[in-house]
Swiss-Prot record:
Gene Ontology CC: one annotated term: extracellular region
Protein name (database record): Disintegrin tergeminin
Tissues with expression: Expressed by the venom gland.
Molecular function GO terms recorded: toxin activity
Protein's job: Inhibits fibrinogen interaction with platelets. Acts by binding to alpha-IIb/beta-3 (ITGA2B/ITGB3) on the platelet surface and inhibits aggregation induced by ADP, thrombin, platelet-activating factor and collagen.
Note: The disintegrin belongs to the medium disintegrin subfamily.
Organism in which the protein naturally occurs: Sistrurus tergeminus
Position of sequence motif Cell attachment site: 51-53
Amino acid sequence: EAGEECDCGSPANPCCDAATCKLRPGAQCADGLCCDQCRFMKKGTVCRVARGDWNDDTCTGQSADCPRNGLYG
């Protein structure tokens, strides 16, 4: 929702302040395939293994999202 940086539905998430729905100090992310322990995973980290003739999808190092590269192997 507007103004939220993270999903504050679960107080168990160590990256997100459940009271404010904001990332905790020092956290870059709270969830996502490219988020590990509140930090963006390194560029090139495989976040989705290829199926068929597609190449693996990899993290950008700048986001918690795992973008589809759309490239054939």
